[in-house]
């Protein structure tokens, strides 16, 4: 596309896209190469221990990711794959295959060679992905509730000791 939303390595934190910026093809960064499709998983290949990976679920395919991400197209449930690549075991295997110490990195070809255990039945992967998504949503809800309670406590303490 001539104009697109660019996602660089600072745009994704954890599994959330926090920002993106509009770019014009003629002046875009040279790393803006990976055209996103709904369902693609973008795996950060530099400092993978940060676990800044993103499952692209937007219906809009006008997003382009940096080449600092490996682009994966899941055979079944994308959330299953996201959960898998976020696991400590997977990160350890990736780090064992990285080059560099200050900024460990893995190239997309080496990443593609890493074997993972996944259900051969797509519906089973879908069910597992749905369970993981539900658990993550519940965790997020409880984290928000905890933050609200901390704010209430802080406000009460301020009023008590004024």
Regions found by a protein language model. Give the residues of each.
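Feature detects amphipathic, helix-rich regulatory segments
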Residues: 1-162
